[in-house]
């Protein structure tokens, strides 16, 4: 008996393990036996998976006898094919909303299970199977487009008897276990709202909502009764009911794709035999009743979420009420015209109800948080079919939208997105543009905040000079036109104003100003450095120019200047300050990305003269206006401005005024030929960036020179164009970044670094015998040849005496001509006798030098010892 006992071994996670193995095999491309091609790209797959997920591939692979066939998909994109492969192997795929329609179309053509209607019943739709074990919250279908908020779960009891009309999603997987707590909380709130209908009725604040909701429910129930009242009608009644169903399904809030497809699929065989038509008609009425009940459920949910439904407890009560209302009409038979009109009227009621719900959403925030049903046009997501009882009851659907469970209607309207827009959002945008155009001070702060913080502590602006066409209040800024006409009104220079941010305590620190020297000699106005009155929140740099005016200016601009057209793309800010001298200050902000302009402020702080002026405690009257700049009146490019300045500099005018700023920080003012200056000398306090020496600016006279090439960045002038190019390449805007390892000195070019390195190089390389050091070899040789008395490298072979120059040695050798038979002293043996005098000792005078005292020392102290030996051997050979 023991041998007959059998044990049952069950693999609990057999299905999930088997599915995960296919995914691993696909990633490793192991045991793949077919290839799918789309748009020139290939994807390998398994025949078993394709056959199981698509009847089309199953039929196609049965007809192919190749071991590794290749299928080329013509009208399918590679991205869609990749998404379908992920869906078949993993059971889920993430895709954007704009690609959803194309993916569903491609899946429909390939008959992918779970994404298409791949029935195998020919042209006749099979009878839908009942699925009592499914919960009402998970409505079946090939794919269900449903509201983001699962408000339909409140009427789950009424949908227990609804049939499963899909019958084709055997391979679709259940959703994952996520956001269970959020869904349970929403279900509890929904159940509480359904049980307390009297509280919802008392909370209704708008009587029109109740009337429209009741009318919508009555008409929808009437349409349901009319659609289900003629089961024994003929083919004509079936066609009329089909016509009634089409406008009704278009007005449903929850769009049932499967029901729409069944309606369209049953329209064709409706003209067949009477026997088959009767069977199809029974199926049709059952499906229509289910679709209509779905629409009524959605309307009930919307009405309950807004507190406007009276006596609505479920779908059964709604259907009974609809039957009672539509009783007289059902007795007389279905009328196609009246049914169609009722369907259209039901759609209108649904739309009106949705609009009223949107308008009254602010009065029911606490209920919208529970149900969170917005309107007909809210976001739609894909919900897969529920296959298991536990998953359908406990789990929520993973949607592709943001979690808006705890957001109110006003917060949803403010949320960015395409589905949240509309007339209200466009009106808000127009109002924002109108307010923004009139708030110039706020605009300046916004521009400063939106500036890229990676540009550093400073933000350099364009320094190309501009000109003023006229002195009228409605003036515009231009450059090219004035330069072409002679540049009579070109301003002399600009002032770069750096506004420092406030300290930690909020106290103003001040600003740094720098007056750019004049670029041309055709200027007619004076440039002074002033302090800004308005301090934005962020650190900014502006170009400030002050024009002296002989005539009186108005203190305020015309109010029409504040309402300029919104379509202008370029905008500049003009701040006008009235003073005793009637001077006008112009603050122009021009962003640029030129390297020269970005290096300008740093060069000013390091090498140029700057003035520091604290922000005033009490600001005077400041008028802010906006001047739009047309496309033809924009500032010229830097290179074009440079060429124009070169042409203008050729025309030297002796009666024009010019301001230059020298390297010491003094303001040099050029006066007219008649000796009268345009403005009185004004003392300014400057701080030199290099030495930090405070001195007072003075005025001097400067004669016209021949410097016609001016730098458009720093204002320095040169006579030769090559000098200007050298200045731009190596001096202007170039930071000395080559640091010497021996000293803190920095160089701008490699040549200067080499020269500085030689100064700190090893001293024993260029050391003379006398103990002096030289930087170069040429200077050392010149010293040894002309100056050094200790360096003698020429030696006589007979007397072993040293000479400084070769010519002295040759003249000394001539004295040995009479003693040719004498053996040189270097080859003779040392003699004990002394007193031998040579006949030529008396003739040597100053030519013969004494024996080198350092000859007995180590030869390592003489760097040219080897050279001396080579030259001596060469002389003997000659």
Swiss-Prot record:
<keyword id="KW-0539">Nucleus</keyword>
<keyword id="KW-0479">Metal-binding</keyword>
<dbReference type="GO" id="GO:0045467">
    <property type="term" value="P:R7 cell development"/>
</dbReference>
<dbReference type="GO" id="GO:0045893">
    <property type="term" value="P:positive regulation of DNA-templated transcription"/>
</dbReference>
<dbReference type="GO" id="GO:0007411">
    <property type="term" value="P:axon guidance"/>
</dbReference>
<dbReference type="GO" id="GO:0007464">
    <property type="term" value="P:R3/R4 cell fate commitment"/>
</dbReference>
<dbReference type="GO" id="GO:0006355">
    <property type="term" value="P:regulation of DNA-templated transcription"/>
</dbReference>
<dbReference type="GO" id="GO:0008406">
    <property type="term" value="P:gonad development"/>
</dbReference>
<dbReference type="GO" id="GO:0006357">
    <property type="term" value="P:regulation of transcription by RNA polymerase II"/>
</dbReference>
<feature type="compositionally biased region" description="Low complexity">
    <location>
        <begin position="329"/>
        <end position="340"/>
    </location>
</feature>
<feature type="compositionally biased region" description="Low complexity">
    <location>
        <begin position="546"/>
        <end position="569"/>
    </location>
</feature>
<keyword id="KW-0221">Differentiation</keyword>
<feature type="region of interest" description="Disordered">
    <location>
        <begin position="115"/>
        <end position="200"/>
    </location>
</feature>
<dbReference type="GO" id="GO:0007526">
    <property type="term" value="P:larval somatic muscle development"/>
</dbReference>
<keyword id="KW-0524">Neurogenesis</keyword>
<keyword id="KW-0862">Zinc</keyword>
<feature type="domain" description="BTB">
    <location>
        <begin position="32"/>
        <end position="97"/>
    </location>
</feature>
<keyword id="KW-0804">Transcription</keyword>
<dbReference type="GO" id="GO:0045476">
    <property type="term" value="P:nurse cell apoptotic process"/>
</dbReference>
<keyword id="KW-0863">Zinc-finger</keyword>
<keyword id="KW-0677">Repeat</keyword>
<feature type="region of interest" description="Disordered">
    <location>
        <begin position="542"/>
        <end position="583"/>
    </location>
</feature>
<protein>
    <recommendedName>
        <fullName>Longitudinals lacking protein, isoforms N/O/W/X/Y</fullName>
    </recommendedName>
</protein>
<feature type="region of interest" description="Disordered">
    <location>
        <begin position="826"/>
        <end position="863"/>
    </location>
</feature>
<dbReference type="GO" id="GO:0016199">
    <property type="term" value="P:axon midline choice point recognition"/>
</dbReference>
<dbReference type="GO" id="GO:0008270">
    <property type="term" value="F:zinc ion binding"/>
</dbReference>
<dbReference type="InterPro" id="IPR036236">
    <property type="entry name" value="Znf_C2H2_sf"/>
</dbReference>
<feature type="zinc finger region" description="C2H2-type 2">
    <location>
        <begin position="794"/>
        <end position="816"/>
    </location>
</feature>
<dbReference type="GO" id="GO:0005634">
    <property type="term" value="C:nucleus"/>
</dbReference>
<dbReference type="InterPro" id="IPR013087">
    <property type="entry name" value="Znf_C2H2_type"/>
</dbReference>
<dbReference type="GO" id="GO:0007409">
    <property type="term" value="P:axonogenesis"/>
</dbReference>
<feature type="compositionally biased region" description="Low complexity">
    <location>
        <begin position="228"/>
        <end position="251"/>
    </location>
</feature>
<feature type="compositionally biased region" description="Low complexity">
    <location>
        <begin position="162"/>
        <end position="175"/>
    </location>
</feature>
<dbReference type="InterPro" id="IPR011333">
    <property type="entry name" value="SKP1/BTB/POZ_sf"/>
</dbReference>
<dbReference type="GO" id="GO:0035167">
    <property type="term" value="P:larval lymph gland hemopoiesis"/>
</dbReference>
<feature type="zinc finger region" description="C2H2-type 1; degenerate">
    <location>
        <begin position="709"/>
        <end position="731"/>
    </location>
</feature>
<dbReference type="GO" id="GO:0003700">
    <property type="term" value="F:DNA-binding transcription factor activity"/>
</dbReference>
<dbReference type="InterPro" id="IPR051095">
    <property type="entry name" value="Dros_DevTransReg"/>
</dbReference>
<dbReference type="GO" id="GO:0005654">
    <property type="term" value="C:nucleoplasm"/>
</dbReference>
<dbReference type="GO" id="GO:0048813">
    <property type="term" value="P:dendrite morphogenesis"/>
</dbReference>
<keyword id="KW-0217">Developmental protein</keyword>
<feature type="region of interest" description="Disordered">
    <location>
        <begin position="228"/>
        <end position="340"/>
    </location>
</feature>
